[in-house]
């Protein structure tokens, strides 16, 4: 997908309740390159979520991390400037120890801002 096409999708997302766009593809399929191109073209902030979130989670005991994770992710997003935030390397959200529903969490944080997230996997029919 070209970044101009993605830009149109981002604009269209502004009017939706969940302002979430997923760039879905297998590992090493170019998702990060698309996000980095958006950084250059549109100046959107880019967050390596696994890196930033893992650093923040170290501040909490293991038993509290599951409960605090949604608020921590929301705070990470809130600390960025801009209406559209690009999230890459979201694999930490799938860690079974954190007991999260990654899609639901991304939907939740996308209610107030456009979120473009790189999602490793495939989309078949209506199944992610």
Annotate each predicted stretch with a short phrase.
Residues 51-78:
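Short glycine-rich substrate-engagement loop in P-loop NTPases that contacts/grips substrate
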Residues 80-98:
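Conserved P-loop NTPase "ATPase switch" module shared by AAA+ and STAND
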Residues 13-15, 76-80, 107-113:
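Conserved catalytic network of the ASCE P-loop NTPase/AAA+ motor domain
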């Amino acid at each position: 997908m070209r970044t101009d096409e993605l830009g149109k999708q981002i604009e269209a997302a502004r009017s939706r309740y969940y302002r979430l766009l997923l760039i879905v593809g297998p590992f090493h399929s170019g998702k990060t390159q698309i996000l980095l191109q958006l950084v250059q073209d549109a100046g959107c902030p880019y967050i390596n979520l696994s890196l930033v979130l893992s650093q923040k989670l170290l501040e909490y005991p293991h038993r509290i991390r599951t409960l605090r994770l949604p608020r921590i992710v929301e705070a990470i997003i809130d600390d960025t400037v801009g209406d559209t935030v690009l999230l890459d390397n979201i694999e930490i959200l799938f860690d079974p120890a954190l007991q999260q529903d990654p899609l639901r969490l991304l939907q939740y944080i996308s209610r107030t801002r456009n979120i473009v997230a790189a999602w490793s996997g495939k989309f078949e029919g209506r199944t992610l």
